[in-house]
Every structure is written in C-alpha cells, then in structure tokens.
Design a protein with these regions (language model features):
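Periplasmic/extracellular electron-transfer cofactor-ligation site
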Residues: 49-50, 55-86, 110-120, 146-153
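Short, solvent-exposed loop/helix junctions and linker helices
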Residues: 48-52, 56, 97-99, 130-133
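Bacterial N-terminal signal peptides
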Residues: 14-27
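N-terminal secretory signal peptides that target proteins for export/translocation
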Residues: 1-9
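Gly/Gly-Pro-rich "capping" loops immediately C-terminal to redox-active cysteine motifs
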Residues: 71-105, 126-130
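Axial heme c-ligation environment in periplasmic c-type cytochrome domains
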Residues: 78, 88-89, 107-137, 154-162
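Solvent-exposed, polar/charged alpha-helical surfaces in well-ordered, non-transmembrane soluble domains
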Residues: 52-60, 88, 102, 106, ...
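Electrostatic cytochrome c docking/interface patches
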Residues: 30-57, 153-163
Length: 163
C-alpha cells in the first residue's frame, strides 16, 4: 500500500513507482501467459482416439498432396519449374521423421515457409485458420503411428533434443 502523505509532496516519485510496478507485473504476467501458450509435443502414436481423428483430418486435408498412404508425390526431391518441390512422403521413405514434433506442428499450422530459408518457395499452406491445434496434433499422431518402430525411436530422439 502506498503512503499517500508521502505522495502528496513527491508526485513524480509515486508516478514512477506506479509505472515501474505496472511494467514489472506486465513482464511477469506476460511470462506466465507465454509459458501457458507454449505447446509441448502432443502427438501420441499409441493413442487410438487421437490416431482415428488424425486419419480423418489427414484424409480430408493432407492426402490430396501427400498421398492416401503417406507416399507423397513422385520425384518429391526434384525441384519443379516454379521453384517449389512436390509434396514429400510422410512414411519412412521421406524426411518427416527427421524433425521434432513441435517443428512439424509449426509447419502444418503456419505453412511450409515457417522454417524455410528466405525466398524458399513452398506449396505447403498454413492450416491455422482451418484446423485446431488438437487436429494438427492428431494428424501428426496418425502419421507417426504408421512408422516402423525403429523410425519412431529415431524421431523421438529429435523430440528429446528439443525439450
């Protein structure tokens, strides 16, 4: 509680204390909010319910480019005339498993350019307006559930490094 008799003769000091106190609360409060909105990897390839949702979402939003069996497009490593690449496979023959869950989540949510170098051309759209976070995590759980055990273990090492 502020001593009002002190403030009557020292308005500028009281004002400064109030401003600094508010800024401190804002920084501390902002850190709490930031900590609450940072998402940890939530793609569980052993969760049948999450996998089922992920398969439905994948079929509706992803299979058109990445293939109904996660096979991707032919020649996915060869640049197209417009400078972008065909959609890669999400099975063990692709590079999806080389990335941590959070990285994959961000690419789906914010689009292919999110982690790409400047001027990189990507046909991967952002799904932040179309899919919920839970649906994106479910798609990742579905994809991971299709990988062989050894690939899942290698990809989990990426998650461990990023925690």
């Amino acid at each position: 509680m502020l001593n009002t008799s002190f403030c009557s003769g020292h308005h500028w000091i009281c004002s400064l204390l109030i401003v600094l106190g508010s800024m401190t609360l804002g920084l501390v409060g902002g850190g709490v909010v930031q900590a609450q909105t940072t998402t940890a990897p939530q793609a569980d390839p052993d969760n049948a319910e999450q996998i089922a949702l992920g398969q439905q979402v994948y079929t509706s939003f992803c299979a058109g480019c990445h293939g109904s069996n996660l096979e991707g497009q032919p020649n996915w490593q060869k640049k197209l005339p417009l400078g972008n690449f065909p959609a890669p496979p999400h099975d063990e023959t692709g590079h999806t498993w080389h990335h941590a869950d959070q990285w994959l989540f961000e690419v789906v949510k914010y689009g292919g350019k999110y982690h790409a170098p400047p001027r990189y051309r990507s046909a991967m759209p952002a799904y932040q307006e179309m899919l919920s976070d839970a649906e994106i995590w479910a798609v990742l759980a579905f994809i991971k559930s299709r990988w062989p055990t050894a690939i899942r273990a290698q990809q989990e090492q990426q998650n461990t490094r990023n925690r």
